[in-house]
Protein backbone atom coordinates (compact mmCIF):
# COMPACT_ATOMS: atom_id res chain seq x y z
CA UNK A 1 0.00 0.00 0.00
CA UNK A 2 2.69 2.53 1.04
CA UNK A 3 5.02 1.38 -1.75
CA UNK A 4 2.31 2.00 -4.35
CA UNK A 5 1.44 5.36 -2.81
CA UNK A 6 4.98 6.77 -2.86
CA UNK A 7 5.86 5.42 -6.29
CA UNK A 8 2.56 6.83 -7.53
CA UNK A 9 3.41 10.37 -6.41
CA UNK A 10 6.78 10.39 -8.10
CA UNK A 11 9.37 8.59 -5.95
CA UNK A 12 12.13 6.91 -7.94
CA UNK A 13 13.58 5.35 -4.79
CA UNK A 14 12.27 3.98 -1.51
CA UNK A 15 13.78 3.46 1.92
CA UNK A 16 12.92 0.37 3.94
CA UNK A 17 13.71 0.11 7.65
CA UNK A 18 14.75 -3.48 8.38
CA UNK A 19 14.47 -4.90 11.91
CA UNK A 20 16.26 -8.04 13.14
CA UNK A 21 15.87 -10.62 15.86
CA UNK A 22 18.69 -11.09 18.38
CA UNK A 23 20.41 -13.69 16.15
CA UNK A 24 20.56 -11.38 13.14
CA UNK A 25 17.56 -12.70 11.21
CA UNK A 26 15.87 -9.93 9.19
CA UNK A 27 12.22 -9.99 10.22
CA UNK A 28 10.24 -6.90 9.31
CA UNK A 29 10.28 -3.66 7.39
CA UNK A 30 9.36 -1.55 10.38
CA UNK A 31 10.57 1.64 12.04
CA UNK A 32 8.98 1.93 15.45
CA UNK A 33 8.95 4.97 17.69
CA UNK A 34 10.55 7.47 17.34
CA UNK A 35 10.30 8.09 13.61
CA UNK A 36 9.78 11.09 11.35
CA UNK A 37 7.08 13.57 12.33
CA UNK A 38 3.70 13.23 10.63
CA UNK A 39 4.38 9.59 9.72
CA UNK A 40 2.84 6.36 10.99
CA UNK A 41 5.70 4.67 12.86
CA UNK A 42 4.08 1.32 13.54
CA UNK A 43 3.24 -0.15 10.11
CA UNK A 44 5.16 -3.33 9.38
CA UNK A 45 5.48 -6.07 6.79
CA UNK A 46 7.46 -9.30 6.76
CA UNK A 47 10.81 -8.55 5.15
CA UNK A 48 10.52 -11.47 2.73
CA UNK A 49 7.05 -10.33 1.63
CA UNK A 50 8.23 -6.75 1.11
CA UNK A 51 11.21 -7.90 -0.99
CA UNK A 52 8.97 -10.07 -3.14
CA UNK A 53 6.59 -7.17 -3.74
CA UNK A 54 9.30 -4.72 -4.77
CA UNK A 55 10.69 -7.49 -6.99
CA UNK A 56 7.40 -7.54 -8.85
CA UNK A 57 7.16 -3.80 -9.35
CA UNK A 58 10.79 -3.50 -10.50
CA UNK A 59 10.64 -6.39 -13.00
CA UNK A 60 9.94 -5.37 -16.61
CA UNK A 61 7.11 -7.45 -18.03
CA UNK A 62 5.49 -8.01 -14.64
CA UNK A 63 1.87 -6.72 -14.56
CA UNK A 64 2.77 -4.60 -11.51
CA UNK A 65 5.95 -3.09 -13.07
CA UNK A 66 6.54 0.61 -12.28
CA UNK A 67 9.26 2.06 -14.48
CA UNK A 68 10.23 4.94 -12.20
CA UNK A 69 11.22 2.82 -9.16
CA UNK A 70 14.94 2.14 -9.62
CA UNK A 71 16.63 2.47 -6.21
CA UNK A 72 16.01 0.85 -2.81
CA UNK A 73 17.73 1.87 0.42
CA UNK A 74 17.88 -0.67 3.24
CA UNK A 75 18.14 1.23 6.53
CA UNK A 76 19.37 -1.59 8.76
CA UNK A 77 18.42 -1.43 12.45
CA UNK A 78 21.57 -3.16 13.74
CA UNK A 79 22.28 -1.29 16.94
CA UNK A 80 21.18 -3.99 19.39
CA UNK A 81 23.14 -6.81 17.74
CA UNK A 82 26.28 -8.51 19.08
CA UNK A 83 29.20 -9.07 16.64
CA UNK A 84 28.20 -12.67 15.81
CA UNK A 85 24.65 -11.52 15.13
CA UNK A 86 25.92 -8.69 12.90
CA UNK A 87 27.77 -11.30 10.83
CA UNK A 88 24.63 -13.45 10.68
CA UNK A 89 22.61 -10.40 9.64
CA UNK A 90 24.92 -9.89 6.67
CA UNK A 91 24.46 -13.52 5.65
CA UNK A 92 20.69 -13.30 6.04
CA UNK A 93 20.26 -10.11 4.00
CA UNK A 94 22.39 -11.58 1.19
CA UNK A 95 20.40 -14.82 1.33
CA UNK A 96 17.01 -13.12 1.36
CA UNK A 97 17.97 -10.88 -1.55
CA UNK A 98 18.94 -13.92 -3.61
CA UNK A 99 15.81 -15.90 -2.67
CA UNK A 100 13.16 -13.19 -2.63
CA UNK A 101 14.40 -10.45 -4.95
CA UNK A 102 16.70 -12.07 -7.53
CA UNK A 103 14.84 -15.37 -7.68
CA UNK A 104 13.98 -14.81 -11.37
CA UNK A 105 17.71 -14.92 -12.15
CA UNK A 106 18.03 -11.20 -11.64
CA UNK A 107 15.26 -9.90 -13.90
CA UNK A 108 14.24 -7.44 -11.15
CA UNK A 109 16.35 -4.41 -11.92
CA UNK A 110 16.52 -2.06 -8.92
CA UNK A 111 19.83 -1.18 -7.29
CA UNK A 112 20.18 -1.51 -3.50
CA UNK A 113 22.00 0.81 -1.11
CA UNK A 114 22.78 -1.05 2.11
CA UNK A 115 22.85 1.52 4.88
CA UNK A 116 24.69 0.48 8.05
CA UNK A 117 24.56 2.80 11.07
CA UNK A 118 28.12 2.68 12.46
CA UNK A 119 31.62 1.86 11.23
CA UNK A 120 31.94 -0.48 14.23
CA UNK A 121 29.34 -2.77 12.61
CA UNK A 122 31.44 -4.00 9.67
CA UNK A 123 30.94 -7.64 10.72
CA UNK A 124 27.71 -7.25 8.74
CA UNK A 125 29.71 -6.56 5.56
CA UNK A 126 31.97 -9.55 6.25
CA UNK A 127 28.96 -11.88 6.56
CA UNK A 128 27.27 -10.44 3.49
CA UNK A 129 30.34 -10.84 1.28
CA UNK A 130 31.10 -14.32 2.62
CA UNK A 131 27.62 -15.51 1.63
CA UNK A 132 27.80 -13.83 -1.79
CA UNK A 133 31.04 -15.63 -2.55
CA UNK A 134 29.97 -18.96 -1.05
CA UNK A 135 26.78 -19.01 -3.14
CA UNK A 136 28.27 -17.63 -6.36
CA UNK A 137 26.28 -14.40 -6.25
CA UNK A 138 29.16 -12.15 -7.31
CA UNK A 139 27.35 -10.92 -10.43
CA UNK A 140 24.94 -9.08 -8.15
CA UNK A 141 27.67 -6.91 -6.62
CA UNK A 142 26.93 -4.54 -9.50
CA UNK A 143 23.50 -3.99 -7.91
CA UNK A 144 24.82 -3.28 -4.39
CA UNK A 145 26.16 -0.09 -2.81
CA UNK A 146 27.15 0.92 0.72
CA UNK A 147 26.44 3.75 3.16
CA UNK A 148 27.22 4.52 6.82
CA UNK A 149 24.30 6.52 8.15
CA UNK A 150 25.01 7.61 11.74
CA UNK A 151 26.66 10.94 10.81
CA UNK A 152 30.09 9.79 11.98
CA UNK A 153 33.41 11.45 11.14
CA UNK A 154 33.94 11.31 7.38
CA UNK A 155 37.62 10.41 7.71
CA UNK A 156 36.69 7.43 9.92
CA UNK A 157 34.25 6.27 7.26
CA UNK A 158 36.91 6.62 4.57
CA UNK A 159 39.38 4.59 6.67
CA UNK A 160 36.72 1.90 7.17
CA UNK A 161 36.13 1.57 3.43
CA UNK A 162 39.89 1.26 2.92
CA UNK A 163 40.04 -1.49 5.55
CA UNK A 164 37.17 -3.30 3.82
CA UNK A 165 38.80 -2.77 0.41
CA UNK A 166 35.66 -1.04 -0.88
CA UNK A 167 36.61 1.50 -3.55
CA UNK A 168 33.30 2.28 -5.22
CA UNK A 169 29.53 1.87 -5.05
CA UNK A 170 29.40 4.21 -2.03
CA UNK A 171 26.93 6.89 -1.05
CA UNK A 172 27.34 9.13 1.97
CA UNK A 173 24.22 10.11 3.86
CA UNK A 174 23.84 13.11 6.11
CA UNK A 175 20.72 13.96 8.00
CA UNK A 176 18.35 13.86 10.88
CA UNK A 177 14.66 13.22 11.43
CA UNK A 178 12.40 15.78 9.78
CA UNK A 179 11.21 16.80 13.26
CA UNK A 180 14.52 18.65 13.79
CA UNK A 181 16.70 21.04 11.84
CA UNK A 182 20.32 20.22 11.07
CA UNK A 183 23.18 22.39 9.89
CA UNK A 184 24.86 21.78 6.55
CA UNK A 185 28.52 21.69 7.67
CA UNK A 186 29.00 17.92 7.42
CA UNK A 187 26.88 17.68 4.27
CA UNK A 188 29.08 20.31 2.64
CA UNK A 189 32.22 18.43 3.73
CA UNK A 190 30.90 15.22 2.20
CA UNK A 191 30.20 16.97 -1.11
CA UNK A 192 33.72 18.44 -1.07
CA UNK A 193 35.19 14.97 -0.48
CA UNK A 194 33.11 13.56 -3.33
CA UNK A 195 34.48 16.25 -5.64
CA UNK A 196 38.13 15.98 -4.55
CA UNK A 197 40.34 14.87 -7.47
CA UNK A 198 41.57 11.34 -6.89
CA UNK A 199 38.74 10.49 -4.48
CA UNK A 200 37.92 6.82 -4.91
CA UNK A 201 35.76 6.07 -1.89
CA UNK A 202 32.75 8.40 -2.15
CA UNK A 203 30.58 8.40 -5.26
CA UNK A 204 27.38 10.12 -4.19
CA UNK A 205 25.94 12.21 -1.33
CA UNK A 206 22.34 12.33 -0.16
CA UNK A 207 20.48 14.26 2.53
CA UNK A 208 17.59 13.07 4.72
CA UNK A 209 14.76 13.63 5.75
CA UNK A 210 13.99 16.90 3.99
CA UNK A 211 10.32 17.77 3.71
CA UNK A 212 10.23 21.57 3.45
CA UNK A 213 10.60 23.18 0.05
CA UNK A 214 13.36 25.45 1.37
CA UNK A 215 15.36 22.54 2.83
CA UNK A 216 15.17 20.54 -0.40
CA UNK A 217 16.27 23.56 -2.45
CA UNK A 218 19.15 24.27 -0.05
CA UNK A 219 20.44 20.71 -0.43
CA UNK A 220 20.19 20.91 -4.23
CA UNK A 221 22.02 24.24 -4.20
CA UNK A 222 24.86 22.60 -2.24
CA UNK A 223 25.11 19.89 -4.91
CA UNK A 224 23.67 16.69 -3.41
CA UNK A 225 22.98 13.67 -5.59
CA UNK A 226 19.82 12.66 -3.78
CA UNK A 227 17.23 13.77 -1.26
CA UNK A 228 15.15 11.52 0.97
CA UNK A 229 11.75 13.04 1.65
CA UNK A 230 8.34 12.04 2.92
CA UNK A 231 6.93 14.25 0.14
CA UNK A 232 8.55 13.18 -3.14
CA UNK A 233 5.98 15.17 -5.08
CA UNK A 234 7.63 18.33 -3.71
CA UNK A 235 10.95 17.28 -5.24
CA UNK A 236 9.19 16.59 -8.56
CA UNK A 237 7.63 20.05 -8.38
CA UNK A 238 10.94 21.79 -7.57
CA UNK A 239 12.74 20.03 -10.42
CA UNK A 240 10.16 21.33 -12.88
CA UNK A 241 10.93 25.00 -12.29
CA UNK A 242 13.58 27.65 -12.87
CA UNK A 243 17.26 26.89 -12.48
CA UNK A 244 16.48 23.48 -10.96
CA UNK A 245 14.89 22.41 -14.23
CA UNK A 246 18.11 23.38 -16.03
CA UNK A 247 20.52 21.74 -13.55
CA UNK A 248 18.77 18.60 -12.31
CA UNK A 249 16.39 15.81 -13.24
CA UNK A 250 15.13 12.67 -11.55
CA UNK A 251 17.41 9.70 -12.16
CA UNK A 252 16.18 6.93 -14.43
CA UNK A 253 17.25 3.32 -14.89
CA UNK A 254 19.72 4.39 -17.59
CA UNK A 255 21.73 6.37 -15.00
CA UNK A 256 24.55 4.64 -13.12
CA UNK A 257 23.97 5.09 -9.35
CA UNK A 258 27.64 4.37 -8.61
CA UNK A 259 29.10 6.97 -10.97
CA UNK A 260 30.01 10.43 -9.66
CA UNK A 261 28.13 13.01 -11.69
CA UNK A 262 30.17 16.02 -12.79
CA UNK A 263 28.11 19.18 -12.99
Swiss-Prot record:
Disulphides: 35-41, 37-179
Signal sequence annotation: none
Gene Ontology molecular-function annotations: lyase activity; metal ion binding; phosphoric diester hydrolase activity; toxin activity
Gene Ontology BP term (one): killing of cells of another organism
Domain of life: Eukaryota
Cofactor(s) required, per the database record: Mg(2+)
Enzyme Commission code(s) on record: 4.6.1.-
Cofactor note: Binds 1 Mg(2+) ion per subunit.
Expression (tissue specificity): Expressed by the venom gland.
Location (main, coarse): secreted
Keywords, sorted A to Z: Cytolysis, Dermonecrotic toxin, Disulfide bond, Hemolysis, Lipid degradation, Lipid metabolism, Lyase, Magnesium, Metal-binding, Secreted, Toxin
Catalytic site positions: 31
Subcellular location: Secreted
Binding, Mg(2+): 15, 17, 75
An annotated GO cellular component: extracellular region
Hydrolase found in the keyword field: no
InterPro entries found in the cross-reference section: PLC-like_Pdiesterase_TIM-brl
Reaction(s) the record says it catalyses: an N-(acyl)-sphingosylphosphocholine = an N-(acyl)-sphingosyl-1,3-cyclic phosphate + choline; an N-(acyl)-sphingosylphosphoethanolamine = an N-(acyl)-sphingosyl-1,3-cyclic phosphate + ethanolamine; a 1-acyl-sn-glycero-3-phosphocholine = a 1-acyl-sn-glycero-2,3-cyclic phosphate + choline; a 1-acyl-sn-glycero-3-phosphoethanolamine = a 1-acyl-sn-glycero-2,3-cyclic phosphate + ethanolamine
Family: Belongs to the arthropod phospholipase D family. Class II subfamily.
Name recorded for this polypeptide: Dermonecrotic toxin SpaSicTox-betaIF1
Amino acid sequence: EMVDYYVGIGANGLEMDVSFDSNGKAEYTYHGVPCDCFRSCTRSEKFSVYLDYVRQITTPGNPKFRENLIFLIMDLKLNDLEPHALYNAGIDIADQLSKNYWKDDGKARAHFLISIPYVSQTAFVDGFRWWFEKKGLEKYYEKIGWDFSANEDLNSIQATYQKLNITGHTWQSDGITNCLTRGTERLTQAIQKRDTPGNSYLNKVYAWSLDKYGSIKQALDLGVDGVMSNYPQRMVEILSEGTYLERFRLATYEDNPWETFKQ
